[in-house]
Amino acid sequence: MIIYLHGFDSNSPGNHEKVLQLQFIDPDVRLVSYSTRHPKHDMQHLLKEVDKMLQLNVDERPLICGVGLGGYWAERIGFLCDIRQVVFNPNLFPYENMEGKIDRPEEYADIATKCVTNFREKNRDRCLVILSRHDEALDSQRSAQALHPYYEIVWDEEQTHKFKNISPHLQRIKAFKTLG
């Protein structure tokens, strides 16, 4: 089972395309939708939905995957639910760059301080990070600096922030999922 979390643009047709691409790894891909506008409520909702899916799950090696803001959530929810994560161009600093787009961007900073201390150290090697060199929305070098000490970084030379085509990375994701 692969759980897919969309980014800030929840209505993007690219979400459906990514789900279809992920089905080459596992036919059971589940899109979990969330508001993107209310961080604390989103966190509660995502934890509840992912936990529900895991309770009914038969896959011994489930995976959670997210793009952009979905990558922010996939890393945290995956850690809290003890499943491996794959994140594409994760928005690591939404409290800095979501101002004017969501109601309370400062809630992201609050969530970060309330999360498990040094959670990335405790999550070491359980997240695969795929970054675009041509991310027009986020500073991928800053993301790499923050994540490289803990996770493997794979660089993509073609895609932009929304990462429309993930197919060149499917074999690597499948291998990572298999490690479970």
From Swiss-Prot:
Disulfide bonds: none annotated. Pfam families: UPF0227. Signal peptide: none annotated. InterPro entries: AB_hydrolase_fold, UPF0227, UPF0227/Esterase_YqiA. SUPFAM superfamilies: alpha/beta-Hydrolases. Belongs to the UPF0227 family. This is UPF0227 protein YcfP. It comes from Salmonella paratyphi B (strain ATCC BAA-1250 / SPB7).
